[in-house]
């Protein structure tokens, strides 16, 4: 085999190893009006929704992402107060004085700021571009019924 070819392949292999896949999987969708929405999944229930320069986080948890390195939040949605959905340190890493937090009453007690407190059936419009309706959700998987009882 040609030594120059081997050298070239070795060189390319060496530098190709330094490339990393994106740290967090993301999908970008285009709405009917042409708006691009990017959904970034971190882990478990933690994700980010970005559109039109706005960033909404759902259940940010520090163990799932480096929130200090991510864009600041316009809105944070906390689904409930379990440790794998509510992490005050993660919220503090992404919040600004203008960040709106929407959560249930129990989760709101963890924050030193006013939150939109929600319960199933309630609707909030924290920003003119966002309307959120709370719905009841249950974990009906065998062995998990005690975590989200109906």
Where are these regions (language model features)?
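Core dinuclear metal-dependent hydrolase active-site scaffold
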Residues: 20-71, 117-150
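C-terminal motif of bacterial Sec signal peptides marking the signal peptidase cleavage site
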Residues: 14-16
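Sec-dependent signal peptide recognition
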Residues: 2-8
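Short, conserved acidic/polar surface loops in the N-terminal third of protein domains
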Residues: 88-89, 113, 143-146
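Short, linear, compositionally biased motifs with a strong N-terminal bias
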Residues: 10-12
